[in-house]
From Swiss-Prot:
InterPro entries: Ribosomal_bS18, Ribosomal_bS18_CS, Ribosomal_bS18_sf
Keyword Transcription regulation in record: no
Alphabetized UniProt keyword annotations: Ribonucleoprotein, Ribosomal protein, RNA-binding, rRNA-binding
Gene name, Swiss-Prot/TrEMBL: rpsR
Record-level GO BP terms: translation
GO CC annotation: cytosolic small ribosomal subunit
Stated family: Belongs to the bacterial ribosomal protein bS18 family.
Protein name: Small ribosomal subunit protein bS18
High-level lineage: Bacteria, Bacillati, Cyanobacteriota, Cyanophyceae, Nostocales
Keyword Ribonucleoprotein attached: yes
Function of the molecule: Binds as a heterodimer with protein bS6 to the central domain of the 16S rRNA, where it helps stabilize the platform of the 30S subunit.
GO MF annotation list: small ribosomal subunit rRNA binding; structural constituent of ribosome
Length: 71
């Protein structure tokens, strides 16, 4: 059984998650562009939902890539 190191959230409770804050959103996606799960990010359920929506919005307006092309 493997254990994940729970990361402390850089987002304070009640702090808004903005889709234009690309530096913050990049902390919650993998090198390939996938959204990290809640058990790794340490966010609350509500924060994780808001984060997912913000990442998807920023992908639609081309602030973040859908996938990171390698090579």
């Amino acid at each position: 059984m493997s254990y994940y190191r729970r990361r402390l959230s850089p987002i304070k409770p009640g702090e808004p998650i903005d889709y234009k804050d690309v530096d913050l959103l990049r902390k919650f996606i993998t090198e390939r562009g996938k959204i990290l799960p809640r058990r790794i990010t340490g966010l609350t359920a509500k924060q994780q939902r808001e984060l997912t929506l913000a990442i998807k919005r920023s992908r639609l307006v081309a602030l973040l890539p859908f996938i990171n092309a390698e090579g």
